[in-house]
Structures are given as structure tokens and as C-alpha cells.
Amino acid sequence: MPCTTILVGKNASYDGSTMIARNDDSASGHFTPKKFVVVHPEEQPRKYKSVISHVEIDLPDDPMGYTSVPNAVDGEGLWAASGVNEANVGMTATETITSNPRVLGADPLVTYQPAKDGKEEAAGGIGEEDIVSIVLPYIHSAREGVIRLGSILEKYGTYEMNGIAFQDQNEIWWLETIGGHHWMARKVPDEAYVVMPNQLGIDKFDLEKALRDQEKYRCPCEEYADLEYMCSADLKEFISKNHLDLSMDGVLNPRDAFGSHDDSDHVYNTPRAWYMLRNLNPKTKIWDGVNAEFTPYSDDLPWCMIPEKKITVEDVKYVLSSHYQGTSYDPYASYGEKEQRGAFRSIGVNRTDFLSLIQMRLGMEKDCNILEWVAFASNAFNVLVPFYATIDTTPDYFSSTTREVTTDSFYWVSRMIGAMADASYKSSIFHIERYQERVMSKGHQLIGKYDALLEKESDAAKRMSLRHQANQEIADMVKKEASDTLNKVLYELSNQMKNAYSRSDA
């Protein structure tokens, strides 16, 4: 999917959490209703079949339950997208990335071939539709996630290029697919953050270390903390055989070897990375002007950086909502060169289906340390809502999305607020800003309230009940605030109707 991702290492976050967040965006002209649910072990298939590629995969018989943000309308597969499992491992998938003809010629994508001219159909590989569902219920650490997905890629292949994040309380790993069957993964440095548009991103990779460490891939973090890179066992031979290393000094740059630097990247991808880095490291580099070290068109923007200050949930939400505020590229701007407005693809685009931010907090019991923050529709106009992730069910307002447009669904209310506020931007934006601040503030307040209650309760059943109670109270608060904001932006837009007339009845 055309998404945007940010990953925050535990020493780069404001409270020692690992954080992974991704905008899940539909293709241009499409909008995909989503819902936030829990998948129980008995609901997980034992034989998985992909709708898109028809690939069939036998799954282990001992799945864990997990949260999920699947498609709400049947017909195109699950697209579970993001979630946390019972082992407190988080995952978001996928960030569609790019490649180049050299890679795709050497290891072609595995695409579905329908039956034709007397030949039987040939199943394709795995893709975004499948990845969370066939990986997350079976892994007990971020490293295990990399290993399981890597082995599936090698066996079944993939029909698309993807980036996937895995997270536990100690580490975040980022895996990128290479061609149809190859892959590499890099640990996010604890003190750094990573930004990812729809482009292969890893720019440094110690291939020799990755290959030396193969026997230690399965070691827990506590046993081998120095694991930084993982990859396909034959990646070195694959690179050499196909002359993929373009470096002059012999130091592999994966972005040059496996990625793209197309004209389309310079309006669709690199500007997004530039804006996020510029926002979180405004003084570290020169981002603007004739002396800029990096511009929206730069192909060498860093994959990761150490932030100038600790990164908060609010920071993540802001950059993932951005439409280039403060620059001449802002489509809503009334300043700067008019021709530049909307020149680049916004991060907070109109066709965002949802945003998920998984926050794994330190120093807390494992049944309440993980918060899954969820937002629906365009981030420029929506709100990010926290929920305890170790749960058996989710509130109806977030889980009952259907094809029908209704104010009983937070997904549809968020879509309506976004469309109306966009069309009445100047008069509605202050309603949106107040809505966002109120929900974020009250969300923090309610989580703090229930954290304190949970700290005093030791009974497991009562603790589960408290988490459900917290999530429902948060959902009720959000429903009230969203309804109020919908009313306000509807009023503002109604006043701008073309058939308005300033004179009233005598």
C-alpha cells in the first residue's frame, strides 16, 4: 500500500518505549473501510489461502491471539495490517517499497498466473494481504518475526516489494524484500528513529557481519545484543552474480543496489522523508535554501537519525499528518509560490485508511504496558486514540465498521469530518485543532487513571476487566468529541454552499 512509516528506538522516545507507526493508505481514488478487532486463536485458519495470489500455506496449530486492523468489507482478503500478539510482539505490514529492473530481472516477483490455454493456474507468492496473518500469531520476539517472514519469503516468494516492521520491548527490526525471494533486515538503533516513504530505504548494511551472525539469528537479545543485521543466506552470491553492488569503494549501499532513484520518487517519496527528518532534526542539517545539504529531491536522505530531542506520540502523529506545513509545498497554504502548492505527495493524504502506533512502555506489567493508538481516515483531520492492547475485544465504535456510511462507526465519522473540514479548511481548521488536542489530552488522562488502578489490582480477571473498561471509556469519550466536531464542521461547510444568500426573511 502507498504508506508512510516511522520507527522510534527506545532511547530516542520520551519514555523509553519502542514505537512503530504507519499510515495505511489506499491507492489513488480508493478508500478502504477498516476496523480494529481482536483475532482469537480459534479464529485463525490452519490452512491459509490468499485471495490475490491463491497461494496456500499450512500454518502452525498453536496460534496466539492478536489485535488487527483488517479490511471491514469482505472480498479482497484480510489485510490485517497491524497488531500486537499475546507474546507482546508488535508488527506493521506493509510499506510498499521500490526496486529496479536489475533486481527484478535477477529474481522476478512471483505473480499469480490464472489457468489459460490448457495450463493449470500457478499460485503467486505472499503479499501485504497475507503477511500479518501468517506471521504475527506465531512469533515471540521481533527477531523471530524477521526469521519467520524471511523463511516464508524464501519458500513461497512475493509478488510485490515490501518493508515490514517488527517490535518487542527491547528492539525494532525493519525487513525489506529484495526481488521475489531475497530479503535483508536491520535493527533500528536504540538511540535513533527511522522514516520510510514508499521506497527501499536501508542505506547501510554490513553484509559480512550479517552472514557471520547467521547462527545467532535465533539468540534472544539478552544472549546476543550485538545482532544488527540479518539477510538471506545467499544474498552475497546473489549480489555478486548479478553485479548489483554499485559502490566505487566496495562499501555496499543497499539503496543503490536494490532500490530506485526515479523521477517519480522525487515527487512521491523523497519529499516525505525530507519533511519528517527536517521536522525532527531541524538544526542538525541544512534543509532549505541554496546551501541545503538535503532537499526534497535528495536520493541520499538518511535512513535513520538521532533526534535532537526525545520523540513523543504527538511528534509521531504530527509528522504522519503532515502536508508540508510551513513550506511553499503545503496545498492549504496562502503564502509562497502558488505553483508549488501540492507539488509533492502529502504524508497526511486524503486516502489514509488508518494510522496505527504501537507503544511498548517500560517498567510495567506485561498485560498493560502496550498501548495501540488508532486513527482512521486522513490524518490531517483525525485523532489518535490509545487503547490497551492486551484485550479480548475492542469497543463497537471502532470494530463495527461496515460498507454502510453511518455515524455509529468511528471510521465513517472520521471520513466525514475529514472531507468536510478539507472543503471548509480556513473556517474549520481551528475546530480540528481543538478536537485533536482534547482527544489526545483526555486519552493520556484516562490511560493514566487506569494505569494507577491496574497498579493496585493483582487479580488477572479483574485486570482484564479494567483494561476493557478503560478502552470503552476512551471510546465513549472519542464518540462524544467526534460527534461534536462533525456538527461544527458540517455547520462551517453548510455556510459555504453555493446557494447561500445573505438576506433572511423580512
Task: Give the location of each predicted region.
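Histidine-centered catalytic/metal-binding microenvironments
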Residues: R438-A506
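Short, charged, surface-exposed loops that flank catalytic or proteolytic processing sites
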Residues: Y138-E144
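A contiguous strand-loop segment
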Residues: P2-E128, R148-N291
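Glycine-rich, aromatic-lined ligand/substrate-binding cores of catalytic
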Residues: L227-G363
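Soluble extracytoplasmic regions of secretory-pathway and membrane proteins
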Residues: A21-K34, T96, L175-T177, V319-Y332, ...
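Short Pro/Gly-enriched beta-strand edge/turn motifs at strand-loop
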Residues: D61-Y66, V146-I147, S334-G342
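Short, well-ordered beta-strand elements within core beta-sheets of diverse protein domains
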Residues: V132-Y138
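Substrate-recognition/cap regions that form aromatic- and gly/pro-loop-enriched pockets
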Residues: Y324-K456
